[in-house]
Amino acid sequence: MGGVGEPGGGPGPREGPAPLGAPLPIFRWEQIRQHDLPGDKWLVIERRVYDISRWAQRHPGGSRLIGHHSAEDATDAFHAFHQDLHFVRKFLKPLLIGELAPEEPSQDGAQNAQLIEDFRALRQAAEDMKLFEADTTFFALLLGHILAMELLAWLLVYLLGPGWVSSVLAALILAISQAQCWCLQHDLGHASIFPKSRWNHVAQQFVMGQLKGFSAHWWNFRHFQHHAKPNIFHKDPDVTVAPVFLLGESSVEYGKKKRRYLPYNHQHLYFFLIGPPLLTLVNFEVENLAYMLVCMQWTDLLWAASFYSRFFLSYSPFYGATGTLLLFVAVRVLESHWFVWITQMNHIPKEIGHEKHRDWASSQLAATCNVEPSLFIDWFSGHLNFQIEHHLFPTMPRHNYRRVAPLVKAFCAKHGLHYEVKPFLTALVDIIGSLKKSGDIWLDAYLHQ
């Protein structure tokens, strides 16, 4: 009989796609684990083995995103990220090189097979309840109230003149509008509004580009990695913030290596100076522009240019060039505070470290928590207070998170997974507490290890 990796007693594992109709080679996990190298990457989906080494560069989500799942069972990630599985499976066919040996488990390592099976049943139940179908009226109203705020801000300045009161009110209204734009483009980026991915991405380019001045491709490049491997160093861009801030396991590592680029034991204090005020205004603006130029995203660049043109044409007649620039900076700083506090309250206080190769549900729950819902918090946070549900089901429209939450709670209770829900203010305070704890750990390791 043929050995593992040999369809019928051949000399070894077959490289390249399996010929149509030929018996598929079989592989063990110990073989698959060897293919997690630059230029040599395999992954497993529904027990079938795919060689993505060359194709990864053409992956619509980016080579880094799909590469984060190399040498792993990517079945649940595959289902989580894609709407039309029948369509995307066509791209898998040429990459198929074999399947897992019959005696091999579907997942590598010490993963809980019953937990994984129950999570897939949970997803199927959500699909049967039609929780992945969007209410387009809900999202139309969201877009409408964003546009209404843009108009209201301009009318305030137009009718009252560019005085302090009208200018401050306009800046606040524009900042709220920009914050809600983040939420709406986030929905579109996850393809959770329209039935076709293409429609979502075209609409996202409009919202992200014309209404915000950023690149939709840049956002997706960053954000999809965050969803694939939340709170994992070198895979989640949101926690790759050293040497400015130390989070999770990096605190001990920097301390032991005697690295002191900043007074990390005071990072919970300087966070207020360079975190919330500057993330959107400085870091995102620079990173976004660099991405569009380096990756030659000219369409996104034109969309972004249309935002800046509209903004300056709208307000320069009242403020002049310098005053309009100051208004823009004020809006960016205000929205930056919203962005940092709202997006990080669910993640920074949670487990942050190196890859542990958990199953999809366990990895998401280890890195996320919820915030107590209310009509205001749901709106203000763009439903990111339901971060657990969002991370488990990224393509689910956010207006259905409340409906799926009881099913998720029951699933977590059955398997002993921590379904954490915090009051809003507690979640915000925990960000500072987490930064202080990491700084203290760094100082102890720096002085004593």
Curated annotation (Swiss-Prot):
Motif (Histidine box-3) on chain: 387-391
Gene name of the encoded protein: Fads3
GO MF term set: oxidoreductase activity, acting on paired donors, with oxidation of a pair of donors resulting in the reduction of molecular oxygen to two molecules of water
Family named by the database record: Belongs to the fatty acid desaturase type 1 family.
Residue ranges that the UniProt entry lists as topological domain Cytoplasmic: 1-137, 185-268, 332-449
Primary site of residence: endoplasmic reticulum
Pathway annotation: Lipid metabolism; polyunsaturated fatty acid biosynthesis; Lipid metabolism; sphingolipid metabolism
Comment field on protein domains: The protein sequence includes a number of characteristic features of microsomal fatty acid desaturases including the three histidine boxes (these domains may contain the active site and/or be involved in metal ion binding), and the N-terminal cytochrome b5 domain containing the heme-binding motif, HPGG, similar to that of other fatty acid desaturases.
Source organism: Rattus norvegicus (Rat)
Catalytic activity: an N-acylsphing-4-enine + 2 Fe(II)-[cytochrome b5] + O2 + 2 H(+) = an N-acyl-sphinga-4E,14Z-dienine + 2 Fe(III)-[cytochrome b5] + 2 H2O; N-(hexanoyl)sphing-4-enine + 2 Fe(II)-[cytochrome b5] + O2 + 2 H(+) = N-hexanoyl-sphinga-4E,14Z-dienine + 2 Fe(III)-[cytochrome b5] + 2 H2O; sphing-4-enine + 2 Fe(II)-[cytochrome b5] + O2 + 2 H(+) = sphinga-4E,14Z-dienine + 2 Fe(III)-[cytochrome b5] + 2 H2O; (11E)-octadecenoyl-CoA + 2 Fe(II)-[cytochrome b5] + O2 + 2 H(+) = (11E,13Z)-octadecadienoyl-CoA + 2 Fe(III)-[cytochrome b5] + 2 H2O
CDD domains the record matches: Delta6-FADS-like (cd03506)
Membrane topology, from the record: Multi-pass membrane protein
Compositional bias ranges of the Gly residues kind: 1-13
Domain Cytochrome b5 heme-binding: 24-101
Keyword ATP-binding found: no
The keyword Lipid metabolism is assigned to this record: yes
Function according to Swiss-Prot or TrEMBL: Mammals have different sphingoid bases that differ in their length and/or pattern of desaturation and hydroxyl groups. The predominant sphingoid base that comprises mammalian ceramides is sphing-4-enine (sphingosine or SPH) which has a trans (E) desaturation at carbon 4. FADS3 is a desaturase that introduces a cis (Z) double bond between carbon 14 and carbon 15 of the sphingoid base (also known as long chain base, LCB), producing LCBs such as sphinga-4,14-dienine (SPD, d18:2(4E,14Z)) from SPH. Prefers SPH-containing ceramides (N-acylsphing-4-enines) as substrates.
Gene3D superfamilies tied to this protein: Cytochrome b5-like heme/steroid binding domain
Subcellular location: Endoplasmic reticulum membrane
Protein name: Fatty acid desaturase 3
Topology Lumenal: residue spans: 159-163, 290-310
